């Protein structure tokens, strides 16, 4: 069923394009916005514009950060262990590990996984930035370990194998988080206790 208002229908269609949002949920969101004060809609619109104009990728780890906070707060922190880098697929995975409160190293966000079937190769994700980072010799604390914390999927395993081969010449310890995370699961949806155990039980590859 389509609404008699073209504006409402357009908003529903835009909401329905978001991941995990079906038409019914999109309708509820649109109705909520419709009955909100105009100021609420303006704040939402402003937040949407801000995220496109003010959010960039950290020049060090490729995680998301504000344009006026680069490097990000994790890379800038003096309390993090700079000798360990945890490689993850997305910014959501960084949030998942940070919620555990267990991992105190740094991160590198790939923004994707190698997936030949989808036409995504190594050059399409942030692998070269990782290699460039490891090749920097002016770091006060050299990187001693790279932890591969990618989703337990075919794409995740393919990417892990590719990165492992590339890192061999660096002479750096390469480890993977422990098994125990369901195959095909996404790290951002795994509970904190399971992620903590996976990080604690990581093993060499």
Swiss-Prot record:
GO MF annotation terms: DNA binding; zinc ion binding
This protein's UniProt keywords: DNA damage, DNA recombination, DNA repair, Metal-binding, Zinc, Zinc-finger
Keyword field contains Metal-binding: yes
Boundaries of every Toprim domain copy: 83-182
Residue spans crossing the bilayer: none
Entry keyword annotation includes Zinc: yes
Gene3D superfamilies: 3.30.60.80, 3.40.1360.10, 6.10.250.240, RecR Domain 1
InterPro entries hit by this protein: DNA_Rcmb_RecR (IPR000093), Rcmb_RecR (IPR023627), TOPRIM_dom (IPR006171), TOPRIM_RecR (IPR034137)
CDD domains: TOPRIM_recR
Zinc finger (C4-type): 58-75
Annotated family: Belongs to the RecR family.
HAMAP family: RecR
Name of the protein described by the UniProt record: Recombination protein RecR
Species whose genome carries this gene: Chlorobium limicola (strain DSM 245 / NBRC 103803 / 6330)
